[in-house]
């Protein structure tokens, strides 16, 4: 970048809106797993959509590439600048712009932390249902850019389903205002959907209008032992049928995952008296706690008679509920502390999850005998975090060196089931070079056409998702 371009960018954001200090920039150049490490000499921190727009206009004019970043919680390298690009942090775009209680909608800037948005909705007696382990750090812009899923997809859908409107800064600096709060709008192409899940490669999301829902008056949570993933799938069908659609979360947990959490997370304990090979964490929401508890207990008793359920425990307080959820939410952290691990974020039809787990696990163990399967996640929507920890006492570096080989084998099996190699984390750089193996030529051509049309100079997050 030449001196003139640097000066123009600094002038746009002012002295508080940029940093060239390596120690300040460094935390933004490495993601949580430490798998990807980047490089950038300049971090811009605009505090308005107009500043973002002006930054993009200058970068487009001078062919200066940049990488947008939210809370830096992404897991596939999509938010990391690898070639010295300008780092565009959206953390200062952190205002809740408006909450319309009657319309059940909320307008927020892209840098608002997910937990902050949830809290703002709760204060108005409403619910923003997107919920995931990184919600204390992840931002709305990042959630939108990756089309995040989380634990409530079963009832409320993925992030894409929770968006009414968007504001997007385009590569040439124009600001696209799609901030409609309408639930029905059939006036041409739904342009906002192009940018959701695009990982900042087509435009920079600066604000959004989000759907809100009535806050449930009651919630019941159960930790349930099941003999197999197949039993879990059948239990899900039974619970959905008997609950009338009140099941909001249904999470699969393997015994080894529970053991890792108890080993590495202070205060974690087994909720049940006897071990089981698998568990599910079930949550239902509705109007009356007593009715929810009674209905869930009756459904679990019926499932037990069918051999689908072993032991189970229902949370009797908010503290107990939080303790049960912490077992699921700390799974990734516990696996990280355990050592080297190879991870996959995949989805298959719910009915295919048991066979997928069996076949894919066998394929990995054939390649790496002794590898420890830690498969968990959102079985209610078919999204499994298909992870493996390195063999006990094995060489972690040697295990990680086989990531691409193992990933390819797993993704081939996913594809055979008509599944997706990225359920909710995105493509980034991790899966970019495999995407063409599982997408048709027509799909890839259309994706490249969109990229060339909206970003002809390839300044927006270059090298991510799709190459042009």
Locate predicted features.
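C-terminal substrate-recognition/cap domain of FAD-linked oxidoreductases
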Residues: 21-29, 224-225, 233-402, 406-409, ...
């Amino acid at each position: 970048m030449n001196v003139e371009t640097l000066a123009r960018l600094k002038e746009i954001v002012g002295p508080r809106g940029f940093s060239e200090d390596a120690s300040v920039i460094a935390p933004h150049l490495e993601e949580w797993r430490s798998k990807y490490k980047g490089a950038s000499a300049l971090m811009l921190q605009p505090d308005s959509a107009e500043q973002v727009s002006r930054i993009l206009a200058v970068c487009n004019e001078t062919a200066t590439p940049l990488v947008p970043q939210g809370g830096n919680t992404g897991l596939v390298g999509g938010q990391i600048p690898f070639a010295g690009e300008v780092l565009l942090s959206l953390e200062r775009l952190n205002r809740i712009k408006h909450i319309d209680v009657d319309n059940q909608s909320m307008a927020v800037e892209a840098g608002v932390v997910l937990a902050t948005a949830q809290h703002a909705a709760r204060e108005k007696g409403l619910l923003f249902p997107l919920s995931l382990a990184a919600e204390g750090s992840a931002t709305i812009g990042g959630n939108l850019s990756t089309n995040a899923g989380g634990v409530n997809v079963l009832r409320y859908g993925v992030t894409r389903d929770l968006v009414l409107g968007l504001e997007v800064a385009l590569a040439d600096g124009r600001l696209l205002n799609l901030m409609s709060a309408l639930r029905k709008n059939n006036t041409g192409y739904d342009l906002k959907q192009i940018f959701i899940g695009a990982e900042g490669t087509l435009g920079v999301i600066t604000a959004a209008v989000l759907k809100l829902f009535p806050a449930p008056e009651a919630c019941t949570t159960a930790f349930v032992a099941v003999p197999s993933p197949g039993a879990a799938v059948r239990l899900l069908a039974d619970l959905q049928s008997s609950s009338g659609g009140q099941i909001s979360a249904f999470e699969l947990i393997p015994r080894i995952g529970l053991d890792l959490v108890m080993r590495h997370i202070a205060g974690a304990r087994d909720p049940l008296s006897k071990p089981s090979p698998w568990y599910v964490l079930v949550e239902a929401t509705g109007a009356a706690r007593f009715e929810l508890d009674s209905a869930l207990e009756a459904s679990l008793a019926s499932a037990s008679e069918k051999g689908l359920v072993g032991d189970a425990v229902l949370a009797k307080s908010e503290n107990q509920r939080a303790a049960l959820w912490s077992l699921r939410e700390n799974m990734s952290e516990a696996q990280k502390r355990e050592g080297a691990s190879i991870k996959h974020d995949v989805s298959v039809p719910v009915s295919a999850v048991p066979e997928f787990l069996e076949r894919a696990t066998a394929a990995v163990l054939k390649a790496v005998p002794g590898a420890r399967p830690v498969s968990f996640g959102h079985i209610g929507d078919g999204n499994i975090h298909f992870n493996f920890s390195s063999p006990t006492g094995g060489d972690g570096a040697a295990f990680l060196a086989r990531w691409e080989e193992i990933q390819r084998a797993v993704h081939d099996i996913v594809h055979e089931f008509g599944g997706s190699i990225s359920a909710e984390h995105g493509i980034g750089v991790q899966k970019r070079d495999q995407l063409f193996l599982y997408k048709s030529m027509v799909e890839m051509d259309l994706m490249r056409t969109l990229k060339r049309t909206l970003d002809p100079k390839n300044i927006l997050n270059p090298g991510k998702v799709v190459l042009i």
